[in-house]
């Protein structure tokens, strides 16, 4: 039986294991000055995205959030201006865990936070971007708040998260994936993106328009090495950390893996099934510390609101979405 054909139902584990996972979930989102964000308040206040959205289903899963986030960064780092901004103005090298926590928390606030909490946070992020500028190794100037760069960063994140869920957790129909992209547009505009994809077709066009600027870089390999061997995940999850990072690489569009020289990191078929089983299990695990669960409580919805009646028809493809974007001539 395919893992996606199993009827899903929310689960709560025995207390010691459940408690360990609750602590791990809290630590993964402990981001220093932003860690005081309360997803339970203000009571009754809606988020930027509705509770019945595809986005709320996708972002509740910690495995696809981690895998998709790594995929997004790999794709971001392929663009030289974004790469310079990320590598020179963030703590990925010196403190990758803190950087990942801040990024993950920002994503959670954007999707699940009350509007009165999310909008000021996004405004702070934009002010920070206003101060980020420099030159690439080739001497080209960049500013982090350039719409073209923000469009790329947003698109890679949107692709990474939804594709990780679709591939490793539960297949989404084309309609659901298109809905997911459309749901994110209002938040993308707040972040400063001007042409955020509203559908997979829009994403394909954006990838085509950016492909000739993407290039191989040793920084991508440095980032992957940090993610594979650094103390990123809680101790009890370290045995699968390398597997999950390679799953993220495997999720990167095939043509881009070729440009970045990453084809050697691909998963074996049995490894892909292992990730899918872990992802399916994570999608049933109701953690009180998960912002998705807390946001449901804020809206007076059941804690397991996002965890019931989510089985997918087995006829939906579980494979990669490989957009027909051609590599540059010298990469063929």
Question: What function would you assign to each model-found segment?
Answer:
Residues 1-152, 156-332:
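Mature, function-bearing regions of proteins
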């Amino acid at each position: 039986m395919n893992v996606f054909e199993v009827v899903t139902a929310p689960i709560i584990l025995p207390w010691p294991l459940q408690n360990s996972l609750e602590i791990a979930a809290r630590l993964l989102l402990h981001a220093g000055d932003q860690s005081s964000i309360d997803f339970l308040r203000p009571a009754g206040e809606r988020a930027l995205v509705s509770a019945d959205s595809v986005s709320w289903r996708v972002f509740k899963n910690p495995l696809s959030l981690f895998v998709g986030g790594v995929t997004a960064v790999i794709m971001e780092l392929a663009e030289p201006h974004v790469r310079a901004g990320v590598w020179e103005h963030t703590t990925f090298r010196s403190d990758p865990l803190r950087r990942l926590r801040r990024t993950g928390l920002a994503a959670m606030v954007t999707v699940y936070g009350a509007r009165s909490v999310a909008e000021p946070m996004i405004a702070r992020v934009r002010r920070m971007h206003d101060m980020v500028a420099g030159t690439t190794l080739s001497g080209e100037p960049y500013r982090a708040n350039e719409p073209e760069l923000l469009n790329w960063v947003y698109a890679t994140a949107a692709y990474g998260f939804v594709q990780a869920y679709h591939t490793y957790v539960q297949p989404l129909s084309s309609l659901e994936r298109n809905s997911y992209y459309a749901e994110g547009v209002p938040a993308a505009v707040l972040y400063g993106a001007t042409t955020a994809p509203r559908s997979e077709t829009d994403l394909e066009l954006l990838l085509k328009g950016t492909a000739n600027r993407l290039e191989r870089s040793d920084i991508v390999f440095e980032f992957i090495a940090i993610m594979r061997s650094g103390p990123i995940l809680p101790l009890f999850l370290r045995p699968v950390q390398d597997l999950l990072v390679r799953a993220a690489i495997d999720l990167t569009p095939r043509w881009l893996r070729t440009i970045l020289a990453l084809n050697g990191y691909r998963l074996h078929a049995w490894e892909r099934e292992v990730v899918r089983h872990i992802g399916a299990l994570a999608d049933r695990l109701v953690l009180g510390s998960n912002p998705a669960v807390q946001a449901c409580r804020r809206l007076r919805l059941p804690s397991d609101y996002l965890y019931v009646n989510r089985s997918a028809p087995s006829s939906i493809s579980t494979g990669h979405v490989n957009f027909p974007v051609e590599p540059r001539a010298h990469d063929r």
